[in-house]
Amino acid sequence: MDPCECSKSGNCNCGGSCTCTNCSCKSCKKSCCPCCPSGCTKCASGCVCIGKTCDTSCCQ
């Protein structure tokens, strides 16, 4: 289950590796945000974002 409460509060912070604001993933080192930035494919495990770009290779 996703440890973040972004869908409820609009904000989350997962162990310092991911920050999600207004359901917008700003920076992720691993899958932890239930929301993805525009242009990022959402994976079953969530979304892995490096910077503000995301492609199939960053999903795990």
Curated annotation (Swiss-Prot):
Binding residue positions for a divalent metal cation 4: 32-33, 43, 47
Residues where a divalent metal cation 6 binds: 36, 40, 43, 59
GO molecular function: metal ion binding
Alpha: region residues: 29-60
InterPro entries tied to this protein: Metalthion_dom_sf, Metalthion_dom_sf_vert, Metalthion_vert, Metalthion_vert_metal_BS
Presence of keyword Glycoprotein: no
Keyword terms, alphabetized: Metal-binding, Metal-thiolate cluster, Zinc
Keyword Zinc among record annotations: yes
Chain intervals for the UniProt region annotation (Beta): 1-28
Residue sites binding a divalent metal cation 7 per the record: 49, 54, 58-59
Pfam families, per the entry: Metallothio
Binding site for a divalent metal cation 5: 33, 35-36, 49
Source domain of life: Eukaryota
SUPFAM superfamilies cross-referenced by the UniProt entry: Metallothionein
Chain residues that bind a divalent metal cation 3: 14, 18, 23, 28
Role noted for this protein: Metallothioneins have a high content of cysteine residues that bind various heavy metals.
Annotated domain remarks: Class I metallothioneins contain 2 metal-binding domains: four divalent ions are chelated within cluster A of the alpha domain and are coordinated via cysteinyl thiolate bridges to 11 cysteine ligands. Cluster B, the corresponding region within the beta domain, can ligate three divalent ions to 9 cysteines.
Family, as annotated: Belongs to the metallothionein superfamily. Type 1 family.
Listed name of the protein: Metallothionein A
Organism: Chaenocephalus aceratus (Blackfin icefish)
